């Protein structure tokens, strides 16, 4: 397994596939290589013309973590991956990973060649105080060492019925998700910082082309969030995919990535 070492000493495990211009896939909450069944499909389909990097975000899978957490440290992880592929790369981010990728694009304007965001889960109607309170609740669970409760809280927050959450906790698949439960605090921190009124000013540093994509079968707030992000980032464009939701078909989104980065 190839690895890179981030600036704070964290080891980031990744896979590299294909040849051509590099695209780094930035995962959303709960996603990592051991459980992700969608990202590998896109990686395979794009590897005939791009170098695709998939990696475990810090604290997940084969990547280590060093406390305390800061969004900048995850940006540093992405910078280390970009260096490993020659100093230039495009970024594709899914959900909260799209927001992290946006922060990296703003922080690394000379290194990121383009950014495709799929459904950044920013609710323009949510106040920064609410976002920070949600982060504080996750941080408290993390401090108490309760990754399972963190995962259950997250799943309930995205609409999974309580009975389904309870059933999932009894299933064989639960252990792989509970294993990364503590990292949900990272995603909530990313989203809280993005909800802050200072975020659009940071994003003005973006120089690369940006495409913000959503599916028309997703929750309405996903559309509103995608629209808001697109108007907050210089030169960003928008696209909506018919029939797609937050759990998209990789055979539909993959060609969009190919067209944008090609």
Describe the predicted segments one by one:
Residues 40, 84, 223-227:
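Short, surface-exposed alpha-helical segments at coil->helix boundaries
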Residues 44-45, 53-92:
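Active-site loop/oxyanion-hole signature of alpha/beta-hydrolase fold enzymes
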Residues 176-231, 237-240, 244, 248-250:
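Conserved serine/cysteine hydrolase catalytic core
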Residues 245-261:
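Post-His helix in hydrolase/transferase enzymes
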Residues 57-59, 120, 241-243:
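Active-site loop/turn elements of alpha/beta-hydrolase fold enzymes
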Residues 120, 124-175, 186-191:
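Helix-rich cap/lid subdomain of alpha/beta-hydrolase
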Residues 3-64:
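Conserved HGGG/HGGXW glycine-rich cap/lid loop of the alpha/beta-hydrolase fold
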Residues 88-126:
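Conserved hydrolase catalytic core segment
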